[in-house]
């Protein structure tokens, strides 16, 4: 009789213990492995990467400033140096950001200047050339005492409009970011500059 009672007590305790374990499992779930910490990404790694300048060397040998034209694709953020319908070179750009969109349509190169400087955007610098305030507009910002305006460098500049919009070397973050100009890589801007002339047609739009 005592053995039977002891057996019943053990069975009861086992049932209670099993129910308790199951309840805890349902409440907290199985132990999950901790996720592996991910290394912090540099800010530069978050910038959209653009394919570099591509050049068709065989077509480049045929290119002259008399037979080339330029096509700029705003959606693709690419500029094309072309002979007829054939692409001689294809390079990354950064066009005008929202509110400062690059003017679209059929244009021509109005001026070539290998060492152009902006008359509107640049920095305020002191007498020693030290930048006191960067990224200013000569139109809307006041120069601190003892400083003067130094226009931003726009190397290998190709003027497209009378009010100063053109193609030139600039920072390429992978999206439209300029004040209206069409920025190019150093190698792209130099190549385009070398193979066009004043009067070369330039088409800017949704190509």
Model regions and ranges:
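N-terminal pre-domains immediately preceding structured catalytic cores
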Residues: 2-207
């Amino acid at each position: 009789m005592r053995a039977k009672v002891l057996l019943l007590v053990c069975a009861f305790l086992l049932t209670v213990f099993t129910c308790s374990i199951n309840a805890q499992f349902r409440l907290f779930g199985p132990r999950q492995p901790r996720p592996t910490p991910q290394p912090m990404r540099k800010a530069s790694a978050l910038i959209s990467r653009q394919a570099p300048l591509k050049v068709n060397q065989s077509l480049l040998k045929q290119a002259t400033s008399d037979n080339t034209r330029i096509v700029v694709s705003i959606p693709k953020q690419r500029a094309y140096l072309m002979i007829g319908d054939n692409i001689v070179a294809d390079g990354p750009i950064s066009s005008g950001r929202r509110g400062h969109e690059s003017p679209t349509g059929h244009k021509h190169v109005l001026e070539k200047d290998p060492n152009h400087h902006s008359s509107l955007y640049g920095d305020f610098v002191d007498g020693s050339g030290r930048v006191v305030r960067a990224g200013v507009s000569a139109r809307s910002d006041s120069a601190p005492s003892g400083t003067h305006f130094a226009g931003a460098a726009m190397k290998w500049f190709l003027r497209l409009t009378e009010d100063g919009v053109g193609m030139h070397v600039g920072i390429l973050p992978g999206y439209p970011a300029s004040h209206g100009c069409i920025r190019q890589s150093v190698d792209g801007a130099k190549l385009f500059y070398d193979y066009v002339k004043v009067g070369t047609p330039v088409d800017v739009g949704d190509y």
